[in-house]
């Protein structure tokens, strides 16, 4: 966020008659269910697109614009208890094969590419998802007798998996936005990951969605619908 020049952005909006635009730090969080036969995922951007909308997603209002400065691609897991989903979500920055071999089912998420276009003009192309793969350190070997092996990663989502978008790109609520994830092969469903903490306790997650997290600025009333 430190690279953004607020004064320059406000000057650009004033130059097109939008001096009343309010700029605030903001995020978009977009997810889609994993489909075992699908290699292309088109993330829905707007609040008005409800086909795949879930309660935890953050979408763009049609009256606003979003200026993206950093972006991350993740696998989204849902906490399960006795095989039943709880609605509690966690993001994965890699396929945790140290926990379960079937994690390789979604490993190709990090072998794809991202394309972003606005009104059919491509502003981001061939952006490899390998940039977003982050494999953290975990404690496999016991350093003292009786200490449990911990396979719980220390993901810090303010940094981990996020990559700067330079130059920044702008999505508009009044335009046709396309955020497309392209994979070499389909990623399979049915991956259940069990994570062990250093006390030996386990937590289970079902990997069932792909996620795109964007951070940047929201320009309230910045779209062409507003004067």
Feature names for model-found ranges:
Residues 1-227:
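Beta-strand-centric surfaces of beta-sandwich/beta-rich domains
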């Amino acid at each position: 966020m430190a690279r953004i020049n607020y004064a320059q952005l406000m000057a650009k909006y004033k130059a097109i008659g939008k001096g009343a635009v309010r700029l605030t730090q903001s995020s978009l969080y977009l997810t889609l269910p994993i489909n075992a036969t699908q290699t292309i995922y088109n993330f829905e951007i707007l609040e008005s697109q409800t086909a795949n909308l879930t309660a935890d997603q953050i979408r763009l209002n049609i009256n606003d614009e979003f200026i993206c400065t950093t972006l991350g691609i993740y696998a989204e897991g849902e906490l399960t208890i006795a095989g039943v989903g709880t609605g509690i979500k966690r993001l994965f920055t890699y396929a945790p094969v140290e926990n379960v071999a079937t994690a390789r089912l979604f490993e190709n998420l990090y072998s794809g590419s991202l394309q972003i276009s606005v009104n059919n003009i491509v502003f981001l192309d061939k952006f490899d998802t390998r940039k977003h793969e982050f494999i953290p350190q975990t404690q496999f070997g016991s350093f003292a007798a009786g200490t449990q092996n911990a396979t719980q990663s220390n993901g810090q989502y303010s940094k981990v998996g996020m990559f700067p978008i330079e130059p920044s790109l702008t999505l508009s609520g009044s335009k046709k936005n396309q955020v497309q994830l392209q994979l070499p092969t389909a990623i399979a469903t049915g991956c259940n990951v069990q994570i062990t903490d250093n006390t030996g306790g386990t937590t289970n997650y079902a990997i069932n969605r792909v996620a795109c997290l964007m951070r940047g600025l929201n320009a309230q009333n910045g779209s062409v619908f507003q004067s």
